[in-house]
Amino acid sequence: SAVTPGTPAGIMVMLAEYGTMSLEEILQPSIEMARGYPIEAQAANSIERNKEEIKKWKYSKNIFLTKPGEEREAPNEGEIFIQKDLRNTLLKLIETEKSALKKGKNRKEAIYEAYKRFYEGDIADEIARSTQEQGGLITKKDLKNYKVFIEEPLKTSYKNIDVYKLTTWVQSPVLLQSLN
């Protein structure tokens, strides 16, 4: 099942509100990886093991099954794995940030312009279209209405180190208790 993507929102809000770097700076390593990297054995073999399930989904099939019709359709260990569409999406976010900065917006405002493009602009259009094309339920309204909630983290000390984790909606309390 698919849910409204929250990771991009979380990253951009945290960067805008608490960070000092640009969106371009933090996305650069991901862009390099999307340009292509030698895939590790565990990932390549997992793709191969799950290829029948992957084949049910047009876009996943196009990304992960690099040798359609061959006995092994997944990439081999060490083969360069490329995610062109991911790279292009990340570049669009950077383009939006740069454009906003050129128009006089500050760093925070420029990051929120990229956020807006992802959740309300052409990227949102493509997410909604491709999801619905495959029977999914995510709409552009879902994307536009997505909100990030900033919460006070849980905290404990472990060997004189402060450890912070998310609140009770994940398994953080268990981890923090196990440290003590």
Question: Model regions: which residues?
Answer:
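Feature marks proteins synthesized as precursors that undergo proteolytic processing into two chains
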Residues: 1-180
